[in-house]
């Protein structure tokens, strides 16, 4: 009797083990196509591109890090790096600041008006990049620039928006801010909606003013979201 019971228990345990193994291998088989796709489209091209950077121009000889040493020695390389850092830091700062300001304004609007203005504010972000680029090119175009026309009408002077290095940097930063601010706005607005109203009520009962409520309630609750959006935008902008 004992032998029969032990045999049955052993059979059940082996059946359970085989089912677990089959489920585990089934999971591996399910993720295998995605794994192959990632390796083929991401890992292999990345490794191959790194290898190509370590060959000579004719791609006939492996030169190691010589190309990187030559690149670091060029003055143009550091000029490009400096411009990229200035462009990224300036654009991300203004996008994050303006996005937070717009989110705070929209969050205090009535629900119906909030929906309308939220949709209007998202137009720059959802507009096709080619179309928005053509629009901004018309704004900064040297011959018929809309901004230069306004400046001249108010007694100012026309600016070389696309030919002068300084003004070209300003125009590209302004365009990037216009395009990227709605992303920050919608992310911060979603974060504001998740903050419990009880926190603001408690702060108001304690006598906290609007700026104090923002400093001690709103900003701490949005700090993680701000860090994530700034990091993501920095990677994309750079």
Which residues make up each language-model segment?
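Short, Lys/Arg-rich, polar N-terminal cytosolic tail immediately upstream
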Residues: 1-22
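A structural signal for multi-pass alpha-helical bundles of membrane permease subunits
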Residues: 23-238
């Amino acid at each position: 009797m004992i032998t029969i019971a032990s045999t049955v228990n052993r059979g059940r345990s082996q059946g359970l083990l085989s089912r677990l193994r089959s489920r585990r291998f089934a999971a591996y088989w399910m993720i295998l196509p995605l794994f192959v796709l990632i390796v083929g489209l991401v890992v292999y091209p990345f490794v191959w591109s790194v290898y190509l950077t370590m060959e000579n121009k004719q791609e006939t000889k492996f030169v190691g890090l010589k190309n990187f040493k030559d690149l670091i020695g060029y003055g143009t390389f550091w000029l490009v790096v400096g411009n990229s850092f200035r462009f990224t830091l300036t654009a991300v700062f203004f996008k994050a600041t303006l996005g937070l300001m717009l989110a705070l304004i929209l969050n205090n609007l009535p629900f119906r008006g909030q929906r309308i203005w939220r949709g209007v504010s998202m137009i720059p972000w959802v507009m096709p990049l080619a179309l928005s680029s053509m629009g901004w090119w018309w704004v900064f175009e040297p011959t018929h620039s809309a901004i230069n026309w306004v400046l001249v009408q108010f007694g100012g002077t026309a600016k070389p928006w696309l030919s002068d290095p300084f003004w070209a940097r300003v125009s590209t930063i302004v365009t990037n801010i216009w395009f990227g601010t709605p992303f920050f706005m919608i992310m911060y607005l979603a974060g504001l909606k998740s903050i419990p109203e009880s926190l603001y009520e408690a702060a108001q009962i304690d006598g906290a003013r609007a700026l104090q409520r923002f400093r001690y309630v709103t900003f701490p609750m949005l700090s993680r979201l701000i860090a994530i959006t700034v990091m993501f935008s920095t990677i994309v902008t750079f």
